[in-house]
Amino acid sequence: MRLTTFIYAITCLPIFISASSWFSSFSFGESKSTDLVSSTSEKIPGANPASYCADWDRGDDHVVVDYINLIPNPPAAGKNLTIETEINVGTTVLNGSYVDIQVKYGFVRIVNERLDICDKAYELAAVECPVEPGIITKQATISLPWAIPPGRYHVLATAYNADGEQLTCVSASVSFSHFGFQLINQDH
């Protein structure tokens, strides 16, 4: 559950905090592409691995991320992650708004789910919907689990208002180099 929260936080919370068990929903399957982050996508300002989606018409977006700072960046297994963000919300974000999240571990899709933006925004930042247009600055801290399998995770999050209005699309790639525990020399 904490890793799902991390995935949400790294891609969606910075966007939807204002608008409002990792392995609990497996959806294994092969993908034609492992890169959800395109080299032509626009990087979101700040200390973070996030970009706006390359194949997304940002002219129709109603949520603009001014910056996201992750502390530490990159995130570390078994440590706290603090997320600082400023978002410009250009439309009223309604109850029933949602984000579709896809997470790939290499070629394998391990998460493919729809989350309620308002529920998550309230859970993580005490933000209630509907959220009126404006600039919102927030900070949140989450605890990452130690047992994050090593490798590269590719995350894609597309968000829509309850009426189907496009909010935004964000992608990110994060690598973890170990499970978060140290090997102990048992020869002594």
From Swiss-Prot:
The keyword Cytoplasm does not apply. The keyword Iron does not apply. Transmembrane segments: none annotated. GO terms for molecular function: sterol binding. Keywords: Lipid transport, Signal, Transport. It holds the Pfam family E1_DerP2_DerF2. Residues 1-19 form the signal peptide. InterPro entries: Ig_E-set, ML_dom, ML_PG-PI_TP, NPC2-like. Residues 20-40 form a propeptide. One of its GO terms (biological process) is intracellular sterol transport. Disulfide bonds: none annotated. GO terms for cellular component: fungal-type vacuole lumen. Belongs to the NPC2 family. Catalyzes the intermembrane transfer of phosphatidylglycerol and phosphatidylinositol. Monomer. This is Phosphatidylglycerol/phosphatidylinositol transfer protein. It comes from Schizosaccharomyces pombe (strain 972 / ATCC 24843) (Fission yeast). The gene is npc2.
